[in-house]
Amino acid sequence: MEDSDSNTDKKFFFKKRRIDSYNYSDEEDNNSSMNSDMTYTNDALKTSSGNAPTISKLTKTYGIGAKLLSSMGYVAGKGLGKDGSGITTPIETQSRPMHNAGLGMFSNTNSSNYHSENEDYLSSEDEVVEGIEQVKFNKTSTEVLGEALLNDSGDMTIVRTLRELRLAGVQLPESILKELDPLNAVPKPKKDVVVEILQELLGIEKSLEAIRQRTSPLEVQVKEYYGQERLLSELEVTLRDESKHVSLYDKIGAILKLSDDELIDRLTSCLLRKELLIEFDLDHLEKPNDILDELTQIIELLAYRMDTTSKFLNRTQTTIFKVIYPKLKKFWEGFDMTKSKIDSAITLLLDFQQVLSFIGCKEHIMEEFVYPKLLQELDNWELHDEVDHVSPRIWVLDFMVLIDDKIKDTIVDKIEAKFFAYCKNWYHRESFCITNSDIIFIKELICERRYYKILCKEFLPKFLDELWERHNDPIYELEDWKEKQEWKEKDSGFFYFMKKLRSYTHYFHPKQYELMMRGTFNNINKILYQWHLYSTVEDLHKSKWWLNWLMNTVFEHSLPTEIELSEIRKSYNIFAMSHRYHLDKSTLDEDFDLRQGLRNLMETQVIDDISQSEQEPTYTVQNIPLGKVSSSFKDVVEDYCLEKGYLISKIPNRYTQLPYGRDQDCIVPLFEIRNGKKKMEVALKHDILWVEDSSGTFKPIYLWALDL
């Protein structure tokens, strides 16, 4: 029998441990059970069989709260306050769907799994607590949370309705409130009438609140309409004024004060259709056009208000289009790449740039009339001037500010391809020499790095192989130096090489040409050195005659440059050493290697590492590191002054004291801003602009407010 009891206790303990959400230890449960049995000996809790339940069953139903109440001396049917007062209704708890999940979709979606997994334990709990009555807290005379005792649901309805009315701002007469005080003394029929009236009043108040919420925006709109009506009245007076005191710009400015975009569009288009009459003479485009200037200002004003990104034109844009485009179309249909037409086209595009962009015609004109002519002219250009064609160097750079990036890249690629083909197919006896102006144009257009890369890869090796190696030998000129021949008629030899070298000077980098001249005169100096070393005294003067003849022939048609003069002086220095009977090799470089020198020069100075430059990222406003941004507030102020035409300069040894910083005492240098005869002194500190007023005090202002 004892064994069976012990087994029963073990089974009961196992169930208790499985459903005990607080996981209390066995010792706590046993101690609490002993104390609770003593406390609940005389309480009113009874089971269905009439016996007092054990404390373990009580804790299974109410958890730790029952333990705490028993420890505090709780007796069933009485409160815990003085004289048995206290709360009469226990706080009802709600179990969560999952013991380890919080709020949200996860706990809801998994609650069924939790219930299914613990179904056995929950059913066991129901079996344990089945038949136990709820704990009842009998309230005495103490009020709950300070409220009066309410007998039925009607009293609660009255109290709640009065509270809602008070929160809604409805003040009931004092006489009605006195009739309801105390509420227990009011007869039930009267209570029913009061409830009905109060609820009806509350419904009316809610309806009024809804109406107020709907009418509040309408009141704002009504005020706006009154303001628009006043503006329309003023606008009518302005538009009816046919005198010249009110300009078209002022009239459109008055229209833009309205808030209705559709009305603005209609009025503006109607006004422009009536008053915009623009004429221009293609033969006198340089003359100022006041109407065009006013139209440009009007478009700048309209661009802030109208959406010009849409592919469909509004009424205002359509009106301007009908006035402007037909007149411009006549010119563009007859456009060709002659000098006069090119100048007129650039002038028209610059003058009408904002107008054409506003009406969406700029890209159409460029793609339909301008771009095809430009690209065709580039295809026909052979890198030299022709009678029937205008060189691209005259018009390409001017058009660069007007064309888009895609066409810019196309033009650059075409010029680069032509120069590459020229260098690749170059031959010294057949190929023409590109003029210096065209070489400068090509460098500027495709950039010097790409220019020298093509030159050193394609042109320079051919130049060295065909001219330097085969014709650069002054010793051949010793045989007939006395004969007066025209060297320009010869197609070989040293003079032919010098003629070609000097004609292609502008092709090379200055350092490259300097190396070539050094190598050329180094060969001449070797001959002079041997002449002075092995010849007789009588023949020494002949070497000077030979050098004079050589220089006079080479530089017959053009004076030598500074680089060439430097090498000429080194050669004549040999004669000075000969007169002193001391001849050294200071003017000679026996180890000189032109190809190696040019190769070193290309790697270090002339040609940068193109692959390294291509690896550098392209920075934009979005990805540029802050470490590479060096702009300061002083730079911003200087840029602003530059745009306004002001001159800003620092005043030497002049400082002022500003009420700025923690101690309100900051010493900063002074700057002077001038605009003609007007000037003012300013100070800069921590992105704040301080301007001196008439009293000599410096006060902070916004940069846009700086005006002279």
From Swiss-Prot:
Protein localization: Cytoplasm; Nucleus
Xref: PROSITE patterns: G_PATCH (PS50174)
Keyword Cytoplasm: yes
GO molecular function: nucleic acid binding
InterPro entries with a match to the protein in the record: G_patch_dom (IPR000467), TFP11/STIP/Ntr1 (IPR045211)
SMART domains recorded: G_patch (SM00443)
Domain (G-patch): residue spans on this chain: 61-108
Entry keyword Nucleus: yes
One of the Pfam families matching this protein, by short name: G-patch
Gene Ontology cellular component annotations, sorted alphabetically: chromosome, telomeric region; cytoplasm; mitochondrion; nucleolus; nucleus; U2-type post-mRNA release spliceosomal complex
Keywords per UniProt: Cytoplasm, mRNA processing, mRNA splicing, Nucleus, Spliceosome
GO biological process: generation of catalytic spliceosome for first transesterification step; negative regulation of double-strand break repair via nonhomologous end joining; spliceosomal complex disassembly
Assembly description: Component of the NTR complex (NTC-related complex), composed of NTR1, NTR2 and PRP43. Interacts with CLF1 and NTR2. Interacts with PRP43 and PRP45.
Additional notes on this entry: Present with 556 molecules/cell in log phase SD medium.
Primary role: Involved in pre-mRNA splicing and spliceosome disassembly. Promotes release of excised lariat intron from the spliceosome by acting as a receptor for PRP43. This targeting of PRP43 leads to disassembly of the spliceosome with the separation of the U2, U5, U6 snRNPs and the NTC complex.
Stated name of the protein: Pre-mRNA-splicing factor SPP382
Organism for this UniProt entry: Saccharomyces cerevisiae (strain ATCC 204508 / S288c)
Gene name, Swiss-Prot/TrEMBL: SPP382
